Amino acid sequence: MAIKDLFNNFFLMDDEEEVESPEERQRRVVQNEENETNNVQQNQPQQSERSYSNQSKLKTVPQKKTTRNYNSEERNVRMNQPPSKSNGKNVVTMNQTSQSYSGYESSKMCLFEPRVFSDTQDIADELKNRRATLVNLQRIDKISAKRIIDFLSGTVYAIGGDIQRVGTDIFLCTPDNVEVAGSITDHIEQMESQHYE
């Protein structure tokens, strides 16, 4: 209830208040104006001293560099420029790559004679680099030779190449940029029959 009474009394006028006459009002206004002018004249020297001290303080404050406007202008320039052609094409299909490499990488062939299965990784790396490889497996046991051929068959299949037997335990592995023409299967069969006799 106290809050309600406070608000009710706030807007009410007491009957005992005197109503100012217009003459009294003018006298009071004139007095206020005179007091203000006197105060202003007395305070002017103090204000000038204050403003001088404020100015000296402002001189000691370092100025802030405006890097934000420069960055936003630079960003606007970059956004308004059309994209360059070099940035626009990041994806290259495998067919385009094979056409561009077919001229000079097909002339190199690597010869390998692995002694252990871990040497097969080097052969696979050469195939991935689009180089033909000739693998001689005559000096390795038959089980390891079979594992190596299985691994190389998977590698050649993954790169779209070919693997061919060209002799007794000798294989030619080629990537997709190398074409092998001709066949020597008859010659291989004759060599195998002589080898086992």
UniProtKB/Swiss-Prot annotation:
Composition bias, Polar residues: 48-58, 78-91
Basic and acidic residues bias locations: 22-31
UniProt key word Oxidoreductase: no
Region span, Disordered: 15-91
Sequence ranges of Low complexity compositional bias: 37-47
Keywords noted in UniProt: Cell cycle, Cell division, Cytoplasm, Septation
GO cellular component: cytoplasm
Family annotation (Pfam families): SepF
Superkingdom as given in the UniProt entry: Bacteria
Cellular location(s): Cytoplasm
Gene3D superfamilies given in the database record: SepF-like protein
Nucleotide-binding as UniProt keyword: no
Main location: cytoplasm
GO BP term, pick one: division septum assembly
InterPro entries: Cell_div_SepF, Cell_div_SepF/SepF-rel, SepF-like_sf
Quaternary structure, from the entry: Homodimer. Interacts with FtsZ.
Entry function: Cell division protein that is part of the divisome complex and is recruited early to the Z-ring. Probably stimulates Z-ring formation, perhaps through the cross-linking of FtsZ protofilaments. Its function overlaps with FtsA.
Assigned protein family: Belongs to the SepF family.
Protein name: Cell division protein SepF
Species annotation: Staphylococcus haemolyticus (strain JCSC1435)
Gene encoding the protein: sepF
